[in-house]
Regions:
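C-terminal non-catalytic regions of proteins with extracellular/luminal or membrane-system context
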Residues: 1-176
């Protein structure tokens, strides 16, 4: 309570940062049940209950709420439609230099005015690639190795390529 009280004395604006790490070598968790703070049945790229509760607490205590999405992975961002979230900015993986630029955006010195080049789905479970994800390791002589791989059964139709192709097929009637 003291921390919130002190922060409110400093500003009526709160900045909330959501981050997700991931990269080469393995897929992201499809069920967060075994992770601290994770929810059974929720995957890594959606908000967990503890994160949603934290966002709600901030919204109740501050007049303005800004959300920063610090992730190179396309998270489910439907929570940004919350009427109490005043602004959102995708900052990717900013590193030390990028954080200076984030500060310039937040104080109004720079207008980011860009557009995302990635497709962000409301529900990642609607994409076929979601069901081919897993924590797979190669085997050698019948033994598991520590080398991971990802199965791309969709070929090149992963991410934006799937959404663009699906949209065109729907619009032209090719998927019937």
């Amino acid at each position: 309570d003291k921390l919130i009280s002190d922060a409110k004395k400093f500003s009526d604006t709160a900045v909330v940062v959501f981050s997700r790490n991931g990269g080469e070598g393995g897929d992201l968790p499809m069920d967060m049940a075994s992770y601290t703070g994770g929810d059974a049945g929720k995957h890594y790229l959606e908000l967990q209950s503890c994160e949603q509760e934290m966002l709600s607490m901030v919204e109740k205590n501050f007049k303005h709420v800004i959300v920063l999405v610090n992730s190179s992975n396309a998270m489910e961002l439907g929570f940004l439609e919350d009427k109490n979230v005043d602004a959102a900015l995708w900052i990717g993986g900013p590193g030390s230099t990028g954080c200076v630029a984030v500060g310039e955006v937040l104080c109004g010195a720079v207008n980011p005015s860009g557009r995302l080049v990635d497709t962000y789905a409301y529900d990642l479970t609607t994409a076929p690639a979601y069901y081919n994800a897993g924590n797979f390791t190669y085997t050698s002589n019948g033994e598991d190795t520590s080398e991971h791989y990802v199965e791309y059964a969709e070929g090149i139709y992963v991410g934006y390529r799937y959404y663009e192709t699906r949209y065109v097929d729907n619009e032209t009637g090719k998927c019937d």
